[in-house]
Amino acid sequence: NKRTRTAYSRSQLFELEKEFHFDKYISRPRRVELASSLNLTERHIKIWFQNRRMKWKKME
Protein backbone atom coordinates (compact mmCIF):
# COMPACT_ATOMS: atom_id res chain seq x y z
CA ASN A 1 0.00 0.00 0.00
CA LYS A 2 1.67 3.17 -1.26
CA ARG A 3 1.67 6.31 0.82
CA THR A 4 0.13 9.38 -0.79
CA ARG A 5 2.44 11.92 -2.33
CA THR A 6 3.03 15.03 -0.24
CA ALA A 7 1.93 18.23 -1.93
CA TYR A 8 4.06 21.18 -0.87
CA SER A 9 2.65 24.68 -0.92
CA ARG A 10 4.47 27.51 -2.69
CA SER A 11 5.56 29.01 0.60
CA GLN A 12 6.86 25.65 1.87
CA LEU A 13 8.80 25.10 -1.36
CA PHE A 14 10.19 28.62 -1.18
CA GLU A 15 11.52 27.99 2.33
CA LEU A 16 12.88 24.55 1.44
CA GLU A 17 14.65 25.90 -1.67
CA LYS A 18 16.04 28.82 0.33
CA GLU A 19 17.41 26.41 2.93
CA PHE A 20 18.82 24.14 0.19
CA HIS A 21 20.57 27.08 -1.47
CA PHE A 22 22.21 27.89 1.86
CA ASP A 23 23.25 24.28 2.56
CA LYS A 24 22.67 21.08 0.58
CA TYR A 25 22.63 19.03 3.79
CA ILE A 26 20.25 19.97 6.57
CA SER A 27 21.21 19.40 10.21
CA ARG A 28 18.85 17.68 12.63
CA PRO A 29 18.22 20.79 14.78
CA ARG A 30 17.50 22.83 11.66
CA ARG A 31 15.23 20.08 10.35
CA VAL A 32 13.25 20.07 13.60
CA GLU A 33 12.93 23.86 13.41
CA LEU A 34 11.87 23.85 9.76
CA ALA A 35 9.40 21.00 10.31
CA SER A 36 7.54 22.91 13.00
CA SER A 37 7.60 26.24 11.15
CA LEU A 38 6.44 24.71 7.84
CA ASN A 39 3.99 22.32 9.47
CA LEU A 40 5.67 19.26 7.90
CA THR A 41 7.19 16.15 9.44
CA GLU A 42 10.96 15.82 9.82
CA ARG A 43 10.74 12.81 7.54
CA HIS A 44 9.15 14.90 4.77
CA ILE A 45 11.96 17.41 5.02
CA LYS A 46 14.67 14.75 5.09
CA ILE A 47 13.24 13.09 1.98
CA TRP A 48 12.69 16.41 0.21
CA PHE A 49 16.40 17.19 0.72
CA GLN A 50 17.44 13.75 -0.55
CA ASN A 51 15.33 14.16 -3.67
CA ARG A 52 16.49 17.73 -4.20
CA ARG A 53 20.16 16.68 -4.00
CA MET A 54 19.54 14.02 -6.66
CA LYS A 55 17.86 16.60 -8.90
CA TRP A 56 20.80 18.96 -8.32
CA LYS A 57 23.34 16.23 -9.17
CA LYS A 58 21.51 15.40 -12.40
CA MET A 59 21.49 19.06 -13.39
CA GLU A 60 25.26 19.45 -12.96
Swiss-Prot record:
Keyword check for Cell cycle, yes or no: no
MF terms (GO), sorted A to Z: DNA-binding transcription factor activity, RNA polymerase II-specific; RNA polymerase II cis-regulatory region sequence-specific DNA binding
Annotated GO CC locations: nucleus
Question: Where does this protein bind DNA?
Answer: 1-60
Keyword Membrane in annotation: no
Subcellular location, in the record's words? Nucleus
Primary location class? nucleus
Question: Which InterPro entries does the record associate with it?
Answer: HD, HD_metazoa, Homeobox_CS, Homeodomain-like_sf, HTH_motif
Please name the GO terms of the biological process aspect recorded for this protein, alphabetically.
Answer: positive regulation of transcription by RNA polymerase II
- Supply the alphabetized keyword list: Developmental protein, DNA-binding, Homeobox, Nucleus
* Name this protein carries in UniProt: Homeobox protein HTR-A2
Give the organism the record lists.
Helobdella triserialis
